[in-house]
Amino acid sequence: MTITPQEALQRTIEHREIFHDEMLHLMRLIMRGDLSPVMAAAIITGLRVKKETIGEIAAAATVMREFANHVEVQDNSNFVDIVGTGGDGSHTFNISTASMFVTAAAGAKVAKHGNRGVSSKSGSADVLEALGVNIDLQSEQVAASIAETGMGFMFAPNHHPAMKNIAAVRRELGVRTIFNILGPLTNPAGAPNQLMGVFHPDLVGIQVRVMQRLGAQHVLVVYGKDGMDEVSLGAATLVGELRDGKVHEYEIHPEDFGLQMVSNRTLKVENADESRTMLLGALDNQPGVAREIVTLNAGTALYAANIAESIADGIQLAREAIASGKARAKVDELVRFTQQFKR
């Protein structure tokens, strides 16, 4: 039975769940632009206030995937997405983007799904443009990029055109809503493995269980206890791991992997150019915190991609990819490949 928008709003006011099929229906109304801005704003605010359930988030992600422009990838093995919800307020350089180059250099295929900076000084799209990558690719071109270079960047506005129907509402509300956590759940290439950073500790257990419902294979959802939506060097990191259909939650520390715990303060940047400089420094094997945090995150991604048997093994592979120059070479390879499609 379908639910009316008014009934859904009443449900959120009473802190009651909107069931799966009802949420599918509501989300389709939003994505088609069939809800008034007032009603759309009220419902997504009501969901936030009552706290979205795993079922509601999974249903919303299912619809967002339905409406996406998909990237068809032939070979799903060792295929991973490295993504963060953003919104952690840390203003660090683009660690997950740097990790993409290292992860690909070590043999994984990476489909990175990202956007321009909203809360951050430099989103993944901003730093890739600063590096010379053409981010404005069609779906078939992204698929070719993944096949050829082991990396593909999916610029979110190109793949989620229906999001324009809620964009003005989100902008005017100016608060976090369910849409802030849907991005990492809706990779247009359908990567079955993922390293996902989140901005709040409660999201670790929630997002990993959403991915479980969505049929993912190997996922690590991470939250650095210093507030980072990455595996952190400055504190312990909470991990929710989905593997073989089962979820395990645990904590990891830099010292577990022979790394020193150091503050992430030196990783802050003011703009995409500063992020580019720090990213290239890490990939050029310059000793320092930037290289170490990229090694740690790429190592975790290699474990998620099933290239490495453990995070520790992944870190070793990441170190070798950087030291050999292969990771740095991946930057030039992606720039060269994507520039041929410049319009």
From Swiss-Prot:
Q: Where does Mg(2+) 2 bind?
A: D229, E230
Give the cofactor binding note. Binds 2 magnesium ions per monomer.
UniProt-annotated binding residues for 5-phospho-alpha-D-ribose 1-diphosphate = 84, 87-88, 92, 94-97, 112-120, 124
> Which EC numbers does the record give?
2.4.2.18
Query: GO MF terms on file?
Result: anthranilate phosphoribosyltransferase activity; magnesium ion binding
Q: Fetch the Pfam families from UniProt.
A: Glycos_trans_3N, Glycos_transf_3
Binding positions for Mg(2+) 1 per the UniProt entry: S96, E230
What UniProt keywords are attached to this protein's entry?
A: Amino-acid biosynthesis, Aromatic amino acid biosynthesis, Glycosyltransferase, Magnesium, Metal-binding, Transferase, Tryptophan biosynthesis
The positions annotated for binding anthranilate 1 are G84, N115
Uppermost EC category: transferase
GO CC annotations?
Answer: cytosol
Spans through the membrane: none
UniProt record, GO biological process: L-tryptophan biosynthetic process
Residues binding anthranilate 2 = R170
**Description of how the protein assembles with itself and partners:** Homodimer.
Q: Give the protein's biological function.
A: Catalyzes the transfer of the phosphoribosyl group of 5-phosphorylribose-1-pyrophosphate (PRPP) to anthranilate to yield N-(5'-phosphoribosyl)-anthranilate (PRA).
Name this polypeptide is given? Anthranilate phosphoribosyltransferase
